[in-house]
């Protein structure tokens, strides 16, 4: 009996110190596969007593889970819809243009002293074959906005859901595609592509962590946020 009482008191003490609990983390399947494993390994070494539950899936479902209180934290790209949540910036990434190595557009790129990438004007996409994503993917909304804003008329549009497949099609000379910078870090294909930034406003995109409006994060959740920030920056800087 005394042993049970001691265990109960120890658990209560841990909760008070915010060192025991559960963390339910949501993240898209695509971002999870190359970004999350290293974060989880470091977090569980730091907080072994936390019940860490990961939900990877599509952002439509994950957003609903966050609103319904089924998630504590959600990693996603900043959109107008995220204004209804508490958010913190994790890192910023470029929206890149992937171009075949032997494509004439490579000759039209210009040096950008403030970037690791050379730059292309969106107008050069007129008449080109573009590989766009499906309408329900967040990247497609950005693609459509760019084409509309800069009055780009593609010669042909291919629609592919898989980001890896899109980039591999570019490598084979089948078109040009848009891709988030973070996604390119773990692409492995026998043929290379060239990546460029676009000479547009807001060419960098915010990757954020969101949680319910009005919530304050306990220490063990705050630790996860800081790890996500660190590993995000390391990913983009090839560390």
Please annotate each region the language model reported:
Residues 105-107, 111-150, 217-225, 232-236:
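Secondary-structure junction motif
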Residues 15, 38-42, 59-101, 106-109, ...:
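Short beta-strand-centered segments that line the small-molecule binding cleft or hinge
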Residues 35, 194-238:
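A late-sequence structural motif
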